[in-house]
A protein has these predicted regions:
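Active-site environment of divalent metal-dependent phosphoester hydrolases
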Residues: 30-31, 52-57, 77-80, 94-97, ...
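Active-site-proximal loop/helix segments of hydrolase catalytic cores
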Residues: 113-179
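Binuclear metal-ion centers of metallo-dependent hydrolases, dominated by the metallo-beta-lactamase
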Residues: 69, 81-94, 174, 178-226
Length: 226
């Protein structure tokens, strides 16, 4: 069965597969490029890579409305639990087999603090195995050589930031593709703010010229079936 992915802008994706609906980093309210409002999305699980407002976003409000389980690092799980929400906490390198598939937390070189400035735990990326397909959502990170180890899992889809300034930019993202060797790449985390303006088509051309991967540039609201 295919995994259906919908890009909602910035780093946010909705995924349907394994009999569940997942939402990753739901920064919708306050996102000038968001394809939907927080009231329009559904979720059984909400994955939060770190506590910055442009990733934690509407996670709490959506979970309160839908009853979704929040999945993230231990500190984010405690934060969600303190608000009466169901949460599953992990740490980097740890994984868990959920009814729909497996989630494993990967390294991400970034920061993490809640909107009030309190410590948000270590940021992470997500390695998802759903319907037998391996999806790597790098979330906010700089380039790191251990991406090669992630690639050894056999990655069908890599979702990589290209915005620069807060994350790796297009040149380092291209190097990441060469380390991971995925089948398909989708660039994210660009154009939301002036400081991360990029041309994703330039990145796509470089990926397809220098690697075997196919690069898919999705506009907010567009979908892809894996």
């Amino acid at each position: 069965m295919p995994v259906e992915l919908t890009y909602y802008g910035h780093a946010c994706f909705g995924l349907k597969g394994g009999g569940a609906t997942l939402l990753i980093d739901p920064f919708l309210t306050g996102n000038p490029l968001a394809a939907v409002s927080a009231d329009e999305v559904e979720a059984d699980y909400i994955l939060v890579s770190h506590a910055h407002g442009d990733h934690l976003g509407d996670a709490v409000a959506i979970a309160q409305r839908t009853g979704a389980t929040i999945v993230g690092n231990h500190e984010i799980a405690i934060y969600a639990g303190n608000q009466g929400l169901t949460a599953h906490g992990l740490h980097i390198g740890g994984g868990w087999d959920f009814p729909f598939g497996r989630i494993k937390l990967t390294i991400a070189h970034h920061g993490s603090s809640f909107p009030d400035g309190s410590y948000g735990g270590n940021p992470c990326g997500f390695l998802l195995t759903i319907e037998g397909k391996n999806i790597y959502h790098a979330c906010d990170t700089g380039l790191f050589y251990d991406m090669k180890l992630i690639g050894e899992e056999g990655i069908e889809l890599a979702i990589l930031p290209i915005g620069d300034n807060y994350t790796m930019g297009p040149k380092d993202a291209l190097r990441a593709v060469k380390l991971i060797e995925p089948t398909v790449v989708i660039p994210i985390h660009y154009d939301t703010f002036d400081v991360i303006k990029q041309d994703p088509t330039d990145f796509a051309r470089a990926v397809e010229a220098e690697t075997k991967a196919r690069c898919l540039v999705l506009k907010p609201g567009e979908s892809y079936s894996l």
